[in-house]
């Protein structure tokens, strides 16, 4: 599957999806002495300009508020959440372009937590076009064992048999470049027997309410491990992708160094 097609799909491409170019209401106010703040609403998102620098505000899943800097080096994505429409008959969201044409694919992600039996034919008939299957993960503990998802093989084969396009994701806990290579090799070995035409995704994220073996990783570490994985996947002939939420993209990953890769933007 070509990169261009997946950017148009429900898996959103580059991370800064909330800052597409567009017009909006502009408000100006004085914030501190000799500082002027301009606020503009773009695609439903508040963009703040202060002292020539642009920022955006967002909330995490716990409704904590954050303000992050917009990076000139990171290309803007044209994805506009105001173009999402709910199909009341199916209950699915669709994404329509400016001409009203549906321009996104519907997909799901699954793992062992969805249970032992998934009726993949029913999934297909419901309008789902692609699936991202969890391949496995690296454990939190000191050993950091690599573990295959208990339902990986069954889910991949079932989805393929139903005619769905299939990608995979791997949850990383790498603490060195060597471990990132191990994770890459683990993933490539497991997908080799299958016709994987969707993205091969590196899932790197914050571990909430628990300790993690990655707690001492730096921004440079996390960013470098993404590169190691994505470059290895690309070299093997697959399409790499990085999974992360807005907070992780804004404050942990160095997005300006990852612009050649697609992102699966997580928002709940």
Predicted regions and their residues:
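N-terminal Sec-pathway targeting helices
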Residues: 1-12
């Amino acid at each position: 599957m070509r990169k261009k097609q997946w950017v148009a799909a429900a898996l959103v491409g580059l991370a800064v999806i909330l800052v597409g170019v567009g017009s909006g209401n502009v408000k100006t106010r004085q914030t501190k002495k000799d500082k002027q703040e301009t606020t503009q609403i773009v695609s439903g998102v508040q963009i703040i300009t202060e002292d020539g620098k642009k920022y955006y505000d967002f909330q995490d899943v716990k409704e904590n508020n954050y303000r992050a800097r917009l990076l000139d080096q990171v290309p803007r994505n044209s994805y506009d959440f105001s173009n999402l429409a709910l199909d009341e008959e199916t209950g699915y969201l669709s994404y329509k372009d400016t001409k009203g044409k549906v321009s996104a694919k519907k997909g799901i992600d699954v793992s062992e937590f969805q249970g032992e039996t998934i009726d993949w034919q029913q999934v297909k008939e419901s309008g789902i076009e692609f699936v991202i299957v969890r391949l496995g993960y690296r454990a939190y503990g000191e050993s950091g064992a690599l573990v295959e998802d208990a339902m990986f093989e069954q889910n991949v084969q079932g989805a393929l048999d139903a005619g769905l396009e299939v990608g995979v994701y791997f949850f990383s806990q790498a603490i060195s470049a060597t471990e990132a290579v191990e994770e890459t090799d683990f993933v490539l070995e497991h997908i080799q027997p299958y016709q994987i035409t969707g993205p091969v995704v590196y899932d790197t994220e914050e571990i909430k309410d628990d300790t993690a073996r990655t707690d001492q990783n730096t921004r440079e570490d996390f960013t470098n491990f993404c590169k190691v994985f994505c470059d290895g996947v690309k070299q093997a002939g697959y399409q790499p992708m990085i999974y992360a939420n807005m907070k992780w993209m804004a404050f942990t990953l160095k997005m300006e160094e990852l612009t050649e890769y697609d992102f699966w933007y997580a928002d709940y």
